[in-house]
UniProtKB/Swiss-Prot annotation:
Family: Belongs to the SLX1 family.
Zinc finger annotations (SLX1-type) as residue ranges: 225-280
InterPro entries attached to this UniProt entry: GIY-YIG_endonuc, GIY-YIG_endonuc_sf, Slx1, SLX1_C, SLX1_endonuclease, Znf_FYVE_PHD, Znf_RING/FYVE/PHD
Cofactor: a divalent metal cation
Gene behind the chain: SLX1
Assembly mode: Forms a heterodimer with SLX4.
Enzyme class per UniProt: hydrolase
Subcellular location: Nucleus
GO cellular component: Slx1-Slx4 complex
Spans annotated as Disordered: 34-57, 96-120, 310-339
Gene3D superfamilies associated with the record: GIY-YIG endonuclease, Zinc/RING finger domain, C3HC4 (zinc finger)
Source species, domain of life: Eukaryota
UniProt protein name: Structure-specific endonuclease subunit SLX1
Length: 421
């Protein structure tokens, strides 16, 4: 679609509400919202500029992020949930029973039998805050949102898991990101910080999805809606593409929404949470489809930046592979036996009958690879292996002639000379 105003931003890649707890005083808790949990946690701990007044006390630092609620499609929705989580009693989304249970209760006195006022749970206690979260996620308003709850601390998860009456809707995912061995770990803050840093808060997971959609819609191929079978107009229609890499199914957004709601039995609602592709029957999540559509139509600059970064990453990877292959090739060539006689050291085995002088001649003959032809003055290269083999071949003879033979004594002519008296 070409009539989308460029001032409208795509759906944020990530936005969450979070729960902080002081590692010094566990009773001190804080609720906030952010698109970048790792950066925000560093601000609260004073490692970066920013933060909040309630978390600025050095007596309470460092803070740890023990739970988050993610899946918000815009900043306004996250701020709305944050306020409702902080002021559940005043929120119109909380159940009436919750408001009544927070009022001061009564109990009978064991001495007089009269009813006396009993103080309720502190509003800022961990069980109270998690109970408020449970109530909001069960409310008719927020239960329709595609929210996920993440827990990074085992003890907080245990408090959450305690019975709270009604159950959550199955569509709300609850994720535990901790191990059972972390309770007494001295590096707890470092472990939690690393877990927060590993959260996927960008569009990197969608870039291949957007590339496939652009290639499919920008081609000259005629495409029909996967639901109503009518011809799609990429310039005017809001089109949703299947998120599975091998599926080319495209549908009108309203057609696909109606298909999902009808299959789930949610007649009368407008926004589904998930469904199955009409073509490949694969599971599709509605927030993922909407993120891709808004990123493709409203975030062209972001798509260009992501594609450029990915190409640079691929080029760096190719260079590393090329350098690694070249280094391995060089090492293999260096490990091969060299044919240069000047650097070659062949093992020379001596025979028991070989004297020291003859052994030296053999070594010099092997070490010399270049000889000069005295007849024509040309240089003749002699392979050391061949020269060595020729001289060792004489070693098989019993009389050890040649280099290994015993020195011959020439008979002088003076032996036959006539003696003159």
């Amino acid at each position: 679609m070409d009539n989308i105003p460029q001032s409208i931003n795509p759906i944020p890649a990530f936005y969450c509400c979070y729960l902080l707890r002081s590692t010094v005083r566990h009773a001190s808790l804080y609720i906030g919202s952010t698109p970048e949990p790792s950066r925000r946690l560093a601000q609260h701990n004073g490692d970066r500029t920013g933060g909040a007044r309630k978390t600025s006390s050095e007596k309470l630092r460092p803070w740890e992020m023990v739970a988050i609620v993610s899946g918000f499609t815009n900043r306004a929705g996250a701020l709305q949930f944050e306020w409702a989580w902080q002021h559940t009693k005043e929120s119109r989304h909380a159940e009436v029973e919750r408001c009544e249970s927070e009022q001061l209760g009564t109990r009978g006195s064991s001495r007089t039998g009269k009813e006396v006022k009993r103080a309720g749970k502190p509003r800022t206690s961990l069980p109270n805050i998690l109970e408020n979260l449970h109530i909001l996620l069960r409310s008719p308003y927020f239960s329709e949102w595609p929210l996920e709850v993440w827990f990074f601390s085992a003890d907080v998860w245990q408090v959450w898991s305690q019975p709270k009456g009604n159950l959550l809707d199955n569509s709300i995912k609850v994720v535990t990101a901790f191990s059972s061995k972390e309770a007494g770990d001295t590096n707890r803050r470092e472990i939690l910080g690393k877990r927060i840093e590993t959260l996927d808060t960008g569009y990197d997971a969608l870039i291949e999805y957007v590339e496939k959609s652009q290639f499919l819609l920008e081609s000259e191929e005629a495409i029909d809606c996967g639901v109503c079978k009518q011809r799609l107009n990429p310039r005017n229609d809001m089109i949703a593409i299947c998120s599975h890499s091998l599926c080319r199914c495209a549908s009108h957004l309203l057609c696909l929404s109606a298909h999902f709601l009808e299959a789930a039995g949610f007649i009368g609602k407008l926004i589904p949470k998930e469904g199955t592709c009409p073509a490949c029957l694969g599971k599709l999540e509605w927030p993922t489809l909407m993120k891709e559509i808004t990123l493709r139509l409203r975030g062209q600059e972001e798509v260009k930046r992501l594609l450029g970064r990915r190409r640079r990453t691929e080029q760096v990877g190719k260079r590393k592979i090329s350098n690694h292959v070249s280094s391995e090739k060089g090492e293999s060539e260096a490990s091969m036996p060299s044919t240069d006689a000047k650097t070659m050291a062949l093992p020379i085995r001596s025979h028991p009958s070989v004297g020291g002088s003859n052994f030296g001649k053999l070594g010099r003959s092997v070490g010399s690879a270049i000889r000069t032809n005295t007849d024509n003055g040309s240089v003749k290269a002699v392979t050391p292996e061949i020269e060595f083999y020729r001289r060792r071949k004489c070693n098989a003879k019993k009389n050890f002639s040649g280099l290994y033979s015993t020195p011959r004594i020439n008979i002088s002519d003076w032996d036959n000379a006539e003696i003159i008296e």
